[in-house]
A protein has these predicted regions:
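Divalent-cation
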Residues: 1-97
């Protein structure tokens, strides 16, 4: 038998490619707010990744603050995957023309 389900937790980041700044936390929440963040990401075609340890670390960061150094490797790996997906989508779109 499983215990009560923990409320959802979600964190959204932004990053300006080519800028010398770290990614920033632009949204964070639990429960209904987390569900809304996830729904908006899905509606906007923004990739979502589940990582309980990373979200726990990032959820403690104040809004509009840069991510902590401890999170940089994990976030960089996620961003690399997103950039690769974007390039693949652009190449596929160019092939259809």
């Amino acid at each position: 038998m499983s215990g009560p389900q923990k409320p959802a937790v979600a964190v959204a980041l932004t990053y300006e490619f080519g800028k010398p700044h770290l990614p920033r936390v632009v949204a964070s929440g639990r429960g209904a707010i987390a569900e809304r963040i996830l729904a908006l990401a899905q509606e906007s075609g923004i990739p979502v990744r589940e990582d309980a340890d990373l979200v726990a670390l990032l959820a403690a960061v104040e809004l509009e603050s840069e991510i902590p150094a401890e999170a940089m490797i994990a976030v960089a790996e996620i961003m690399a995957q997103i950039f690769l997906l974007n390039r693949q989508a652009q190449a596929a779109a160019a092939d259809r023309r």
